[in-house]
């Protein structure tokens, strides 16, 4: 027992020199100094932007046909396929027998941006745009209604159509 205690309390001159001269501290400062003058890899986000992937999935939008009629046929496939249950759809039958949505809501606080809604849509009505920067000060600000989604689609239709055309050969 005494031998174990003596072995743990032995202190060599080499250990004393390392602790007295702060060798580990100097090594750490030298490493920091080497990296201090290298090219920076950090991006200062609001001022600098990195390129987005062509398949980036951002803010949702509802599209219209060229004649102004909304594309959604109320098939509710996107609502059924959504793993986060973020989409709510209500529909009515029109006088001509076709269905159209009366309510199309997406709760972006639930949405995981998987893109299943876009993939399942048979008429390319719901799409995910390249819009990365959107925010809300209250929880309700991230609850997008049909009118809000149509407004996003109307505003960015040219970019959405170009992205769809560029990605068509991969689908």
Curated annotation (Swiss-Prot):
Binds 2 [4Fe-4S] clusters per subunit. [4Fe-4S] cluster 2 binds at residues 82, 111, 114, 117. Keywords: 4Fe-4S, Cell inner membrane, Cell membrane, Iron, Iron-sulfur, Membrane, Metal-binding, NAD, Quinone, Repeat, Translocase, Ubiquinone. Its main location: membrane. [4Fe-4S] cluster 1 binds at residues 72, 75, 78, 121. Gene3D superfamilies: 3.30.70.3270. Pfam families: Fer4_7. Its EC number is 7.1.1.-. It is a peripheral membrane protein. GO terms for molecular function: 4 iron, 4 sulfur cluster binding; iron ion binding; NADH:ubiquinone reductase (non-electrogenic) activity; quinone binding. It is found in: Cell inner membrane. One of its GO terms (biological process) is aerobic respiration. One of its GO terms (cellular component) is plasma membrane. It catalyses: a quinone + NADH + 5 H(+)(in) = a quinol + NAD(+) + 4 H(+)(out). Its cofactor is [4Fe-4S] cluster. Residues 63-92, 102-131 form the 4Fe-4S ferredoxin-type domain. InterPro entries: 4Fe4S_Fe-S-bd, 4Fe4S_Fe_S_CS, NADH_quinone_OxRdtase_chainI. NDH-1 shuttles electrons from NADH, via FMN and iron-sulfur (Fe-S) centers, to quinones in the respiratory chain. The immediate electron acceptor for the enzyme in this species is believed to be ubiquinone. Couples the redox reaction to proton translocation (for every two electrons transferred, four hydrogen ions are translocated across the cytoplasmic membrane), and thus conserves the redox energy in a proton gradient. Belongs to the complex I 23 kDa subunit family. NDH-1 is composed of 14 different subunits. Subunits NuoA, H, J, K, L, M, N constitute the membrane sector of the complex. HAMAP family: NDH1_NuoI. This is NADH-quinone oxidoreductase subunit I. It comes from Paracidovorax citrulli (strain AAC00-1). The gene is nuoI.
């Amino acid at each position: 027992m005494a031998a174990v205690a003596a072995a743990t309390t032995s202190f060599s001159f080499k250990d004393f020199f390392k602790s007295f001269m702060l060798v580990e501290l100097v090594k750490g400062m030298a490493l920091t100094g080497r990296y201090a003058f290298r090219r920076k890899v950090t991006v200062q986000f609001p001022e600098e932007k990195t390129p987005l992937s062509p398949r980036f999935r951002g803010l949702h939008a509802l599209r219209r046909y060229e004649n102004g009629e909304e594309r959604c046929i109320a098939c509710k496939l996107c609502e059924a396929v959504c793993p986060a249950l973020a989409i709510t759809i209500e529909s009515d039958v029109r006088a001509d027998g076709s269905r159209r949505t009366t309510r199309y809501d997406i709760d972006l606080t639930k949405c995981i941006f998987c893109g299943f809604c876009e993939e399942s849509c048979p008429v390319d009505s719901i799409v995910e745009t390249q819009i990365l920067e959107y925010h809300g000060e209250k929880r309700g600000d991230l609850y997008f209604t049909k009118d809000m989604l149509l407004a996003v689609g109307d505003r960015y239709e040219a970019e959405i159509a170009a992205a769809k055309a560029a990605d068509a050969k991969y689908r």
